């Protein structure tokens, strides 16, 4: 069977702060530049016909950062959602969020929900932002939901595949395909509590390029390498 581009790309956007430091600028400037690349990479994936793109924007661990930086990131996110809405509408891009947004302030939550609603029928590409997201937290929340619906008697009658299907149906990503390709910029070689369940069979790509410097040519090279890899999913050729 002829190899094809991934259906679902996930990106750990790492290196904004280090990029800013190298430029002699504040970390906040690095985040601003990173937001521009979010727009670009979404457009590049749409041009390639890739249906789903998930971007790790703010993790459950990022609250440990200095309050001034966290506050800036929240304001930057709200501004991004407002400023980019015409782009989503014009390019028929659907916007979705995974993660626990209940802790965000009302204005930010409303901006997220408004853009999700406005773009819910768009079909060109679905862009998913992972916000206040951690894979362990997601799985724990899923188990809590299931615990309210399953009795010991019901559980005893289920096969492991039944349980896997139930978990899939209750994750934040319930209606999304598994991740085929996971990219991390910034040089680190770990996946940092990101989509541990969904990326079980993903092809991993690590680059030393800091996220604000990540470009179309590098993405294209990764996509070409993806086409060359043999994905056997535990089987044989």
Curated annotation (Swiss-Prot):
GO annotation terms (biological process): polyprenol biosynthetic process
Source taxon at top rank: Bacteria
Gene Ontology cellular component annotations, sorted alphabetically: cytosol
EC primary class: transferase
Enzyme nomenclature, EC number: 2.5.1.-
Lineage: Bacteria, Pseudomonadati, Campylobacterota, Epsilonproteobacteria, Campylobacterales
Protein name: Isoprenyl transferase
Keywords: Magnesium, Metal-binding, Transferase
Quaternary assembly: Homodimer.
Annotated signal sequence range: none
Organism of this sequence: Helicobacter hepaticus (strain ATCC 51449 / 3B1)
Residues given in the record as Mg(2+) binding sites: 14, 203
Database matches in InterPro entries: UPP_synth-like, UPP_synth-like_CS, UPP_synth-like_sf
Record-stated family: Belongs to the UPP synthase family.
